C-alpha cells in the first residue's frame, strides 16, 4: 500500500482527532523510525512511552514475546505476578507507597484529579489550576483541564471547577489559589 493509499484509508475510516504528518511509519529501532518511503527519522516526538524507551530494543521485544506466550492480558479483577513485581520495583526504587497502573496519560491525569479530589474532599476543595496552553488528555475532565479553547470546541459546557492561569505567571498562580483549590 502506498503512503497516499494509507492516508486515504485513514481519511475514510479513522476519526481525525489528531493533525497527522503525511508519513506512514513502518519500522522503528532505537531512537529512529522509518517511513514507507524509506526515510530514516530521528524520533523526537514527546508524550509517548517510546520516546523514553526507544523502538524495538531486543530485551523489550524478547520480554513481550515471552509474556505473550504465557498470558497477554489479565483484568484487574485478578492478581498478576509480573504486575505485582513491577509495583514492588517502582515503589522500592521510587518514592515508596503504592502504584496506580493505567493505560494512557489521560487516564493518569484523570486518576490524579480524582485522587486530589478524594484527598481534599473533607476540606471542601474541588477546584483545579492548570496553565494556558497545556494539554492533559482527551477524557472529559482532561479536556477541561486542557487550557486550549480549540480542544473545548464541541464539548461545551465543560466541567466546573477548573481555573486557567498563564505559564510562568507566579502572581496569577498565587491569586488563583483559594481555600477551594484541590490541586
Sequence positions of predicted segments:
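Active-site and channel-lining beta-strand-loop segments
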Residues: 23-44
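A non-catalytic, amphipathic alpha-helix used as a structural packing/dimerization or gating element
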Residues: 5, 9, 63-66, 85, ...
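Short secondary-structure boundary/capping elements
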Residues: 25, 56, 82, 165-168
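Active-site-adjacent loop/helix segments that line or gate small-molecule/cofactor pockets in enzymes
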Residues: 1-29
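Glycine-rich loop-to-alpha-helix module at the N-terminal edge of alpha/beta enzyme cores
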Residues: 12, 40-125, 129
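PLP-dependent aspartate aminotransferase-fold enzymes
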Residues: 87-183
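Gly/Ser/Thr-rich beta-alpha loop segments that engage phosphate groups in nucleotides
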Residues: 30-32, 49, 54-56, 107, ...
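Short acidic-hydrophobic sequence patches enriched in Asp/Glu that either
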Residues: 2, 56, 60, 82, ...
